[in-house]
Every structure is written in structure tokens, then in C-alpha cells.
Amino acid sequence: MARLIFHFVFALILAAYLLSVTDAIPRGWQEPCFCPSKNPYCDCGDDLQVPTTSVISPKPIIEQCARCERNSQCNKVCPATCKYKVCIFNRTCEFSTCHCYRC
């Protein structure tokens, strides 16, 4: 009888642990999106980028580039009313710093 109770308690502890582990796994998590990309889940749109590591000048040379619409960190910077973004690409860390403009 004691063995049966021990196995029952052990099974409950194991089930509780497995449930807590599966709840901790993020659902629907995707890899960060870098554009341009061949990933079909990346929604890449047009953006404006300043290809320089220096501070943005009053009249920067702006060229068309790609960005992610939904899941790029750059997008979280701008509100929905933003007309366009200018991004300064930092070659050291391979990351763009973006600023919003309403022009």
C-alpha cells in the first residue's frame, strides 16, 4: 500500500513539473526578422536608411532599403502616425538606429 501511495505522489509531482515546463515554453515565438529576407514570415516593407556610422546630418544621403514591418526592433521606435524613418546603420554591431520623421 505504501508503495502505491509513493508511486501516486511521484506521478503527481512529475505531472506538475511537466505542466510547468510546457507552460514556460513561449508559444508562437519566432526568430527575429532581418530584411531583406527569404523567410516567408518576414513582412518586409520599404524604409529609408542612411548608410553611415556617423551622426545624421541636416541633409543626409537617403537611399531606399528594406525593413521588417511587424517584428523588427526598429519598428517599435515609431508610432503608427510616423511618415517615414531614417536609420543610421552601425557597422560595428550590425544594427540600425532609427529615428522618426513626419516630413
UniProtKB/Swiss-Prot annotation:
GO terms for biological process: defense response to fungus; killing of cells of another organism. Keywords: Antimicrobial, Disulfide bond, Fungicide, Plant defense, Secreted, Signal. Disulfide bonds join 44-103, 68-87, 74-98, 78-100. It is found in: Secreted. Residues 1-24 form the signal peptide. Its main location: secreted. The keyword Transmembrane does not apply. GO terms for cellular component: extracellular region. Belongs to the DEFL family. This is Defensin-like protein 268. The lineage of its organism: Eukaryota, Viridiplantae, Streptophyta, Embryophyta, Tracheophyta.
